[in-house]
Amino acid sequence: MNLKQEVESRKTFAIISHPDAGKTTLTEKLLYFSGAIREAGTVKGKKTGKFATSDWMKVEQERGISVTSSVMQFDYDDYKINILDTPGHEDFSEDTYRTLMAVDSAVMVIDCAKGIEPQTLKLFKVCKMRGIPIFTFINKLDRVGKEPFELLDEIEETLNIETYPMNWPIGMGQSFFGIIDRKSKTIEPFRDEENILHLNDDFELEEDHAITNDSDFEQAIEELMLVEEAGEAFDNDALLSGDLTPVFFGSALANFGVQNFLNAYVDFAPMPNARQTKEDVEVSPFDDSFSGFIFKIQANMDPKHRDRIAFMRVVSGAFERGMDVTLQRTNKKQKITRSTSFMADDKETVNHAVAGDIIGLYDTGNYQIGDTLVGGKQTYSFQDLPQFTPEIFMKVSAKNVMKQKHFHKGIEQLVQEGAIQYYKTLHTNQIILGAVGQLQFEVFEHRMKNEYNVDVVMEPVGRKIARWIENEDQITDKMNTSRSILVKDRYDDLVFLFENEFATRWFEEKFPEIKLYSLL
């Protein structure tokens, strides 16, 4: 297989949703249907000791939530699929945001009873902004929920995107019979004891079956005929531009509708895209010269070895283990001898990868999120990955002063992961951590104790707003007021932490010559 054929066989996507919509369950079932795992265990099965394949971190297994982005690769038909299961909890939107920079499409999971929820909306907007094609899986049809047309209208009106239902449900909840596949005109029954049924071109059942007298069946056929009469053909170009989403109905927990979705996904999802550089150069996935970027760093995937893995998206060319690459930020050459692929925490050495693949590089502290790696004589760097402005700030210290070495090591690694943001006061070197939400601090505290054996003391700073400074050379000590703290971030850039909006406006009016700005 040549490079072009290899690249065309790659499909790389992220799964996005609000917490509890069934995102991680869908991930498990996709792995199950691909043969990557033998048993699709239930995500919530804490009492049985079974945890989702993608929820590998101890805190995730205990709480049943995804707080990091897991990466898994599997083969299906003639395709190699890279799937990223992202954090559903809003406090970890920064990690999710960066993950969405590394994929070529996204799958949006919606709970049929709840419809579009706040976190789904937020993540959808990121996909829309990037023009990422979005596939929609409406989940939990075996429970009572909103009517199909109501859900489609909600998606179209709330998200401003056209919908195209690929299948249609017959009933829901206890009366859920199955789904009608529009393309094959077949009915796939929900219960195993039922056989697949066939419809003719007029949507009449070809077999004798009691369901013809069922009101749910009659309603489903009427609704589907309305959809067909609208006469809109599936527009693949609109999908690829992010203007149309194909919609699939099913139940991930019951393994129903998942394989239909997977079959359609590999048919319609895009192959790896070209990427833009800071130098305004478009890098084609078919370029012979290797390039990639780091979008995530994860410490302690193997707690026994205190390892650090940098997750790299291959953008162009072929990666070969042992090859020499240049880290563009430092302009230093390095030989990559340790590279890995993933099934959550199960790792396997990677000798070869092409555009679209996600691989892990063992990191001794060389890499930062957003780093560009290139082979040959290339000199470009890919565009920076986004960083969120924190909204909560805490002073942090080690409870036991004898644990300072472990304390600083833990903070250094967790900050480099992008799990939390780091600041230091100018004169006292007091460490202040910033986060988007409270759960980030809870996970930080948990990981410091479990992974670094350090109990930490955290104390609110009483500051809510962070503003960076364009013209740092004009900052003086007199600008540090009782309602603000001047600190440095991990890159040694000056940052003001303000008490509230009023304090921010007061500062801007008193010192108009200082140009403040926020991150995302």
Swiss-Prot record:
- Mind telling me which GO cellular component terms the entry cites? cytosol
GO BP annotation list: regulation of translational termination; translational termination
Q: Does the keyword Membrane apply?
A: no
Q: Does the keyword Protein biosynthesis apply?
A: yes
Q: Which residues form the tr-type G domain?
A: 8-277
Subcellular location as annotated: Cytoplasm
What does the UniProt record say this protein does? Increases the formation of ribosomal termination complexes and stimulates activities of RF-1 and RF-2. It binds guanine nucleotides and has strong preference for UGA stop codons. It may interact directly with the ribosome. The stimulation of RF-1 and RF-2 is significantly reduced by GTP and GDP, but not by GMP.
Family stated for the protein in its record: Belongs to the TRAFAC class translation factor GTPase superfamily. Classic translation factor GTPase family. PrfC subfamily.
Under PANTHER family, the record lists: PEPTIDE CHAIN RELEASE FACTOR RF3
NCBIfam families in the record: prfC (TIGR00503), PRK00741.1 (NF001964), small_GTP (TIGR00231)
The protein's name: Peptide chain release factor 3
Instruction: Specify the species.
Output: Staphylococcus aureus (strain NCTC 8325 / PS 47)
